[in-house]
Design a protein with these regions (language model features):
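Tandem CBS (Bateman) regulatory domains
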Residues: 1-11, 49-84, 91-100, 120-149
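Glycine-/small-residue-rich active-site loops that bind phosphorylated ligands and cofactors
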Residues: 13, 20, 45, 84, ...
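The conserved cystathionine-beta-synthase
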Residues: 15-32, 39, 85-103, 110
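A glycine-centered beta-loop-beta connector
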Residues: 28, 36-52, 99, 107-123
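Charged, low-complexity, helix/coiled-coil-prone segments
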Residues: 34-45, 64-72
Length: 149
């Protein structure tokens, strides 16, 4: 059985809840990520998603009287705190089914209360591509003649 520890990202970019929207957007942009764990030490306390960041940005733009800008909105005011997590020993199948069922883009991997990694829908696409390539390598080509294989 393949476990999450085989595909999860462990070189994590995290943010503090006292950081601001501008910093969150900068980290997401510079690191090409859509999910930003919010940690106190190694404990996961929240999650900022690209969707959260865009919604917060949109709310600033819609209110012309607002004096708030990206530096004034704190991460703790826009982060999601009700976060589904998974243990690194969970199977890939279990995690993939959970992501699909709940229509979420990532699962932080938490063991003994500490954030150890994150697995995203992109990680599962990479697994699917790998499996498809393996199938293609083992199956004969449909259009090929027997002597061409």
């Amino acid at each position: 059985m393949m476990n999450l520890d085989m595909i999860m990202s462990t070189n994590l970019i995290t943010i503090s809840r006292k950081d601001n929207l501008a910093r969150a957007r900068e980290l997401m942009h510079d690191n090409s990520i859509h999910h930003l764990p919010v940690c106190v030490d190694k404990e996961l306390v929240g999650l900022v998603t690209l969707t959260n960041a865009l919604a917060a940005t949109d709310s600033i733009l819609r209110d012309p009287d607002s004096r708030m800008h990206a530096k004034a909105i704190l991460v703790e005011d826009m982060m999601v705190t009700d976060i589904a997590t998974v243990d690194e020993n969970a199977s890939l199948r279990q995690a993939a089914l959970f992501l699909e069922k709940h229509r979420i883009g990532c699962l932080p991997v938490v063991t003994d209360g500490e954030l150890h990694g994150i697995v995203t829908d992109t990680d599962f696409v990479a697994v699917a591509i790998n499996l498809l390539e393996q199938i293609e390598d083992t199956e004969p080509l449909e259009d090929a003649q027997p002597d061409e294989i």
